[in-house]
Amino acid sequence: VTTEAAIQVRYPKMMLSVLMAGTFTGLFGETALNMALTNLMSQFSLSAGQAQWLVTGYLLTLAVFVPVSAFLVRWFNTRVLILTALCVSLAGCLIAALAPGFAVLLLGRVIQAVGTGVILPVMMSAALLIFSVYQRGMVMGMVGIAITLAPALGPTISGFIITLFSWHAIFWLSALVYAAIILLAVKSIAPIGDITRPRIDILSLLLSSAGFSGIIYGLAILAEHSLRDPAVWGSLLAGFSALPYLPAVRRTWRCR
């Protein structure tokens, strides 16, 4: 077994640290607004269901863009893709921080989730490619900690921030973190993988997006509705029905 990494980059540790920081900040944002939902309901005159969309919308966007990023890394330079995703997440935080109403706040959340959905899979790929096989166990352990710790800490940290300031401060803080990450990324991020520009398997993308989105949406609204509600079981049924077709579609696509 070779002791060298599959792809040699100048700053592998710094590159992975930047990707982990970007992913951590994005996944922190996934749950950070949970503690502010009551305040937002009062400020914007929202129902509980409407306010919940600020969380559900983020999750649905992740469910769509994580599979899409598998194609993006084969179509675009990885360095450009990562920097763009970080800038998109930064823009989303700024929009949310300045949001005058619910619609703009939701838009900012979705835009931030787009960047997170791209960075997360790239980080996983980079962890496997820029480190040797002997280092991968430790590296993947660190990646796993970042992925699980960020959403767990979101409500705790954001609750402290809201107590001292307001919900706007959550996004201002995230924006500052993203800005620092971008500055480090300019120096440390290197391209990984080849740009092959394969044909885009639209059907697989649609099936994966529908499958994961349906499951996430169904589970999200289950908190307020009975399992007998058509919106709940219909979403779950659509999601679980779409995913089993993915392997067959992928095999058919490769045979073309």
How would you label these PLM feature ranges?
Residues 1-8:
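Short, Lys/Arg-rich, polar N-terminal cytosolic tail immediately upstream
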Residues 11-27, 58, 88, 104, ...:
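Hydrophobic transmembrane alpha-helices of multi-pass secondary transporters
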Residues 11-69, 119:
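Extracytoplasmic
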Residues 18-21, 54-57, 84, 107-108, ...:
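Hydrophobic core positions of alpha-helical segments in small-molecule transporters
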Residues 25-36, 61, 78, 170, ...:
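Short helix-kink/termination motifs in transmembrane helices of multi-pass secondary transporters
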Residues 25-29, 95, 99, 111, ...:
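Residue-level hotspots within pore-lining transmembrane alpha-helices
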Residues 66, 70-203:
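Helix-loop-helix hairpins in multi-pass membrane proteins, especially solute transporters
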Residues 163-256:
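Hydrophobic transmembrane-helix bundles of small-molecule transporters
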